[in-house]
Each structure stands twice: as structure tokens, then as C-alpha cells.
């Protein structure tokens, strides 16, 4: 587990540097050109690194296994209200469609992470995560 954790840590430090460079370049370009820009990074899965159980790898039963990072930046002021909001990966489609200006039948602002009307829905998962907030009404 220690070797896996060290390898994973090194990979994450490298990824963080790449993401920093991409976001910095995106922000600088948006500011220079005045072009409305949205930048998003969403991991495809979590990774257990021995924090909750004595194993490393994919896990659907520990927070390290099902929590994933979301990085979101927009040159528009409106999406900044999304800071520190909980987000579920299955809510990515409404967010991306909204950012692209695409509307659809049965569109619900409550599902759009960047909307002022967004409402968090706690996922129905078998694993226990005491840090997940309850659903918003």
C-alpha cells in the first residue's frame, strides 16, 4: 500500500502541475482576448490509497474511491456562485449544455451546478460518507 500511495502521490503532483499550467494559460488568454471562457476538469474516478482500508486501487465503498475532484473556472461572474457547492458527476451534462447555451425539453435549473437555482441531491450509494451533505429541498 505504501508503494502504491507514493506512486499515486507522484502522479497527482505531476497532474496538478499540468492542470495549473492549462488553467493559467486559459485564464491569461481569456483576459487578453476578452473571449468568454469556461474551463473544467473532472476526474473519471477516485482512488483508494490506504486512508480508509488497507488496500490501494478502485473502491466503491470508501470516500477515496467515489469522491472525485471538480475544478471549474469561468471568465463570467455568474458561475462563481458554484464555489464550495457539492457536485455529482452525473450532473455534468446539464452544466455543459448550459455553458454551451443549449436548452432542452424538461431542463431543470435545479440540476445545473452553475445555476442560482441548483439543488444538491445526495446520491443513493451503499457506502457511508458522513461528510456528504443531505439533499437540499
Where is each model-derived feature located?
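Catalytic domains that recognize anionic headgroups
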Residues: 1-137
